[in-house]
A protein has these predicted regions:
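Short glycine/threonine-rich loop-to-helix capping motif typified by GTGT followed
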Residues: 63-69, 97-108, 132-142
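Charged (often Lys/Glu-rich) extended helix/loop segments that serve as interaction or gating elements
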Residues: 109, 120-186
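Conserved beta-strand positions
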Residues: 55, 90-92, 123-125
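Active-site-proximal loop/turn and secondary-structure-junction residues that shape catalytic pockets
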Residues: 11-15, 57-59, 94-96, 127-129, ...
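Solvent-exposed alpha-helices and their adjacent loops that cap or buttress functional pockets
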Residues: 2, 24, 46-47, 89, ...
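Active-site-proximal beta-alpha core segment in soluble small-molecule metabolic enzymes
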Residues: 1-87, 99, 109, 118, ...
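A broad, structure-centric signal for solvent-exposed, well-ordered loop/edge residues
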Residues: 39-41, 62, 97, 130, ...
Length: 186
């Protein structure tokens, strides 16, 4: 390996907080991280090339108690791995906004990882910071009718804003008039 190269492993902490499995990175048969139960023995016995761990086990959660519970599980299952790592990435999935609760649990989780295990702690920005960070600008190319519904054909597709399809999320439209005379499917 190159001298400055660091290798991390994405783990699945196998602790779920979501009711909707579509958004649950820790659901059964998830491809989003190696399950702790599958890699625990290998990791506990040592991995000289592993620099850190990454997990992501939530989606749009305002409750940081869930993060603390995850960190406590990691400590109980992989405490010695944490002690021998340089960093940990707490992933995303938590909302840092006016609806957040148990922020003291966030502080405790980070403090535990830094002070007890000596880890550099990263957290991904999440939708709180990036959801409204930009705009998708589109032009109506054509209007058609199908089955009595007006449809606007745009110069963009769902591929440019996949969460509108994946998560059944309706983005705000700059010129949208809620009670306007016209209604279109886009």
């Amino acid at each position: 390996l190159a001298p400055n190269l660091e290798i991390g492993l994405r783990i699945n902490p196998e602790i779920s907080f979501l009711d909707d499995s579509r958004y649950d990175p820790c659901r059964a048969y998830s491809k989003l991280g190696a399950p702790i139960s599958s890699v625990k023995e290998t990791l506990v016995n040592g991995s000289p090339i592993l620099s850190g761990l990454l997990f992501h086990n939530n989606c749009n959660s305002p409750d940081f108690q869930e993060l603390l519970l995850t960190v406590k599980k990691l400590e109980s299952e992989l405490g010695c791995v944490l002690d021998n790592s340089r960093w940990i990435n707490l992933g995303g999935g938590y909302l840092f906004d006016g609806d957040s609760v148990n922020l003291d649990s966030f502080d405790e989780a980070v403090w535990t990882l830094k002070s007890k295990h000596g880890l550099e702690v990263y957290i991904e920005p999440g939708s709180t910071f990036v959801r409204d960070a930009g705009f998708l600008v589109s032009t109506v190319l054509d209007l058609i009718e199908n089955g009595g519904k007006a449809i606007a054909i745009l110069d963009t597709s769902v591929n440019h804003l996949p969460e509108s399809f994946e998560y059944d999320w309706r983005p705000d439209m700059l010129t949208d008039i809620k009670q306007g005379r016209y209604s279109y499917i886009i």
